[in-house]
Amino acid sequence: MNTFGKKLTLTSFGESHGVAIGGVIDGLPAGLKIDADFIQSELDKRRPGQSSFTTARDEADKIEIFSGVFDGMSTGAPIGFAIFNNNQKSNDYENLREIFRPGHADLTYFKKYGIRDHRGGGRASARETAVRVAGGAFAQLLLNELKIEVLSGVLGIGKVVSDKIDFDFAQNSQIYALGNEEAMKEAVNKARSEHDSVGAVVLSVARGVPAGLGEPLYDRLDSALAAALMGINGVKAVEIGAGVNVSSMLGSANNDEMDELGFLSNNAGGILGGISSGAEIVLKSHFKPTPSIFKEQKTLNLAGEAVDFELRGRHDPCIGIRGSVVATAMIRLVLADMLLLNASTKLENLKKIYG
């Protein structure tokens, strides 16, 4: 499906080498101040071509908003926007017209649809995530009204793990590293010099989230967040709170005890029973190494024959770097959606509006 969310929805369109990518945000309340400069600044964080640690494809990623905004305020109507593609090099992919790239969605898209756009992965390209970043920025404008913030940074690249968790540092880091930036850069450069790629772990936190968000049983907050993050290109695992470590804990260690001031620990990552507890929400997204590598590889062609091929084009050596910006956006979209869904949960909420 190409639409995300229940009450607040984002529908995206476009392909990597098409005319444009874009989206429609529906369900954003009327009367919200739309800060176009903020939205553009979020897109700039993800924009390619800004350093040697991302793809050389240099797109301006300037957003054009077509509808749903009047005098700088949301009208309650769908907000349509587009980001035009200007730096495609489709000829770089001509040798892939008859070939399925290992680690990519080429084979599976062809098996599902019987047709595929070989130019940069088409619809399956991470180019589409610019739309999610824009959508997440719109969602953050709503979250700002409730003083909710979402922060992400790169916790590790390859075997290098950050020596600290500093989101202020990450915002000023060229690779959004939470710490140990130079060692992480070295890991990326080493992989790239060997015509290879490297994976990453992204840490995200949401602060100021009120207790009560989540729609049990089948749209729990934790499952919605996990699905949103797993839907990002290259994410292969998501952890919440203490994550996989809880399987080796005793209950006495895992339980987050409480006193008058709140929780004494946060192994649950701010979510209990699929509902936000009021504690900080903590998530980790594990990104696989970029499948686009410049080594000769064995694969199949459209005829099902084994062939050797070597990739051309422009690609990120570590997708987790820009992926950290996308993770922030998806968490924002989920939280904004859950806020709107939760608004009618209690009768007293309806009475405040209509009583």
From Swiss-Prot:
Keyword Flavoprotein applies: yes
Its pathway is: Metabolic intermediate biosynthesis; chorismate biosynthesis; chorismate from D-erythrose 4-phosphate and phosphoenolpyruvate: step 7/7
Q: What cofactor does this one take?
A: FMNH2
Give binding positions for NADP(+).
R46
Listed GO cellular component terms? cytosol
- Which reaction is the catalytic activity of this chain? 5-O-(1-carboxyvinyl)-3-phosphoshikimate = chorismate + phosphate
Q: Where does FMN bind?
A: R123, A124, S125, N233, G234, G273, K288, P289, T290, P291, S292, R314
Which major enzyme category is it?
Answer: lyase
The EC number(s) attached to this protein equal 4.2.3.5
| SUPFAM superfamilies reported in the protein's UniProt record | Chorismate synthase, AroC
- Any single Pfam family the record assigns to this protein: Chorismate_synt
Q: How is the cofactor bound?
A: Reduced FMN (FMNH(2)).
Chain segments annotated as transmembrane: none
PROSITE patterns hit by this protein: CHORISMATE_SYNTHASE_1 (PS00787), CHORISMATE_SYNTHASE_2 (PS00788)
Q: Name one GO molecular function term.
A: FMN binding
- One of this protein's GO BP terms? aromatic amino acid family biosynthetic process
**What family does the Swiss-Prot or TrEMBL record give for this protein?**
Belongs to the chorismate synthase family.
**Name by which UniProt lists this protein:** Chorismate synthase
Which organism is this protein's natural source? Campylobacter concisus (strain 13826)
